[in-house]
């Protein structure tokens, strides 16, 4: 994976565990450090990303030379200044899921911590891909939007199947989708990044557009889950 070096940011791990500034038992602190190191050994990060031309339709975005149609007012607004986008798919592989299930049987606390570490890891891989796309855009006097995933805003999760086919993701990095539109391996992410002209107005990710807005524990505590 080139220069990809995951940190497994401790503060992010704590946030996913619901940490709100309370005192943490030393045993838990040690377990977190143990899991941060263990997750690096058991994950196999893989990612693909491809540049695609897009066409603005009346109520959707067509991704050229694919069967992927992105429906929704939010994604239309997100990509309104874009003629190209990047489709990306990231996964940590199956081993992390197997290890987490094992710990669920013998040490539930460790299973929860390892899961939080895995969530942190997949987001760090996504950040890495986004940085690559950003750097390439700058070289061409372009810029990018923030990454936008199916399930965010009014972009339905049922685009996942077409999304994976557009990238040939099952063949390239083993990603599949269930009949309920869940990605497998479970610690996987798909996202869209718009390519925009340098100096274009950049949109800010809004919690109110998230499908989990009403139930989000981060928001209730005055925090956000993204940049």
Would you name each region that the model predicts?
Residues 1-114:
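Active-site helix-to-loop segments that bind/position phosphate- or nucleotide-bearing substrates
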Residues 27-30, 34, 120, 124, ...:
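Conserved active-site and cofactor/substrate-binding residues in soluble primary-metabolism enzymes
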Residues 37-44, 134, 138, 168, ...:
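Generic secondary-structure signature for well-ordered alpha-helical cores
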Residues 41-52, 127, 139-143, 216:
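Intrinsically disordered or highly flexible coil/loop and linker segments, enriched in small
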Residues 107-166:
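Internal, well-folded beta-alpha domain core
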Residues 140-217:
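Short terminal or interdomain "cap/linker" segment that borders an active site or interface and mediates
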Residues 223-227:
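Short cysteine/histidine-rich metal-coordination sites, predominantly Zn2+-binding motifs
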């Amino acid at each position: 994976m080139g220069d990809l070096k995951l940190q497994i940011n401790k503060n992010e791990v704590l946030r996913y565990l619901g940490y709100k500034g309370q005192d943490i038992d030393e045993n838990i602190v040690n377990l977190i450090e143990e899991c941060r190191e263990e997750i690096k050994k058991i994950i196999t990060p893989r990612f693909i990303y491809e540049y695609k031309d897009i066409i603005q339709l009346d109520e959707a975005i067509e991704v050229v030379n694919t069967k992927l149609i992105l429906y929704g007012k939010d994604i239309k607004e997100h990509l309104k200044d874009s003629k190209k986008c990047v489709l990306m798919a990231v996964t940590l592989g199956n081993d992390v899921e197997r290890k987490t299930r094992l710990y669920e049987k013998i040490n539930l606390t460790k299973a929860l911590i390892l899961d939080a570490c895995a969530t942190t890891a997949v987001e760090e891989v996504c950040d890495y891909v986004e940085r690559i796309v950003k750097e390439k855009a700058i070289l061409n006097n372009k810029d990018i939007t923030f990454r936008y995933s199916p399930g965010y805003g009014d972009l339905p999760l049922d685009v996942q199947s077409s999304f994976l086919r557009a990238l040939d993701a099952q063949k390239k990095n083993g990603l599949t989708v269930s009949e309920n539109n869940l990605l497998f391996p479970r610690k996987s992410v798909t996202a869209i990044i718009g390519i925009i002209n340098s100096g274009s107005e950049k949109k800010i990710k809004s919690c109110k557009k998230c499908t989990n807005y009403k139930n989000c524990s981060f928001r209730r505590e005055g925090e956000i889950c993204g940049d």
